[in-house]
Amino acid sequence: MKVLIVGSGGREHAIAWKVAQSKKVDKIYCAPGNAGISEVAECVPIGAMEFDKLVAFAKEKEIDLTVIGMDDPLVGGIVDVFEKEGLRVFGPRKNAAILEGSKAFSKDLMKKYNIPTAAYETFTDPEKALEYLETAKMPIVLKADGLALGKGVLICQTLEEAKEGVKTLMMDKKFGSAGDEIVIEEFMTGREVSVLSFVDGNIVKIMSSAQDHKRAKDGDQGLNTGGMGNFSPSPFYTKEVDEFCKKYIYQATVDAMKAEGRPFKGVIFFGLMLTPYGPKVLEYNARFGDPEAQVVLPRLENDIVDVFEACIDGTLDQVDLKFDNDRATVCVILASDGYPVEYKKGFPIEGLEKFKGKDDYYVFHSGTKFNENGQIVTNGGRVLGVTATGKDLKEARKKAYEATEWISFENKYMRHDIGKAIEEA
């Protein structure tokens, strides 16, 4: 069969790499893809938001399955457009992708169906938001309602910071219309854990837990980013936590969406905070995380295409989801110095060939492209996800950091403390 993957990041590279292992698949296309993805797929120069062109391409090439990796096209309704044309596509429809597309929607859903989350208020009027802050307890969290590349969440320590945050999101419109409405919620303490799951509209099957590192600098300092590294599984995601979440969060979310007439098919990413009062939902994403996909998919033992098809057909109950639970994976992001603010790109990348033929070592491309001389060069803030698998997290971490030294480019930057929490577990 022929598969089209929509997106251009490390997540899509991990998906394409996994799809390439399927015995059912004989041709993979990726739109727009990147230099790394071109090793396993034919990259085509169509943007992820060019729905008409993507549909035309899928028809022309007789694509059997399209997989949407990114949040923007999902929230924009790409699945509805494909389905209307009779094309098979993996991902939630527009009315279900709102779970990620609107923070206010997801918070109201959790409140209505008693899914544990932080206390919150929503605002469309900046004056009312500022008024509310005057009596609120600090620190406090401000979230842009819409998509903001994972950067629309501000943690404010003081009232001044919080007021400045309202100005940034709602008045200066730093993230455009994403800040037309904001959620102000209580600051929760605890460890963050990400849990990825497959959903077929009726039931949910959990993949694995992972732990992200959102801040740009060591010691969780600096600005929020799309993620600077990850490890899986999380040692803090215990059997007790799993049982609680299965009882009160995972299936409850799928049931809530179904009850609202918005059945969800695809991947739900549960962003959880393990608070002293039990696990609570921080956020939902309507697709694989990036770099969560890079640490979870190497341990998936099923044919991923079978799982995608089961989600589309509502037959996920017939799939026995298998993970290599005897192995752990760590991913360290190599970024362009200056990310997530300003950075230069176009620098040649050396050392990629060192990953060839090495078991347990992977390099997933995020921001790369070929220059006019056919050289692979940097093309984004997050450039590569250097990933390694080991018998435990300690070994995987050691290997991943060892492998970061194989790669060089002019403004290479990384955090040196990805997975440091493993030692505290």
Go through each PLM region and give its residues.
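Internal nucleotide-binding/catalytic subdomain
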Residues: 153-294
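Short, well-ordered beta-strand elements within core beta-sheets of diverse protein domains
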Residues: 230-233, 331-333, 382-390
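A conserved helix-loop-beta module that forms one wall/lid of the active-site cleft
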Residues: 92-152
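ATP-binding N-terminal substructure of ATP-dependent carboxylate-amine bond-forming enzymes
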Residues: 1-94
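Active-site "cap" helix and flanking loop/linker of ATP-utilizing ligase/carboxylase catalytic domains
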Residues: 246-268, 285-358, 371
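Short acidic-hydrophobic, aromatic-tinged amphipathic segments that line or gate anion-handling sites
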Residues: 43-49, 121-125, 156
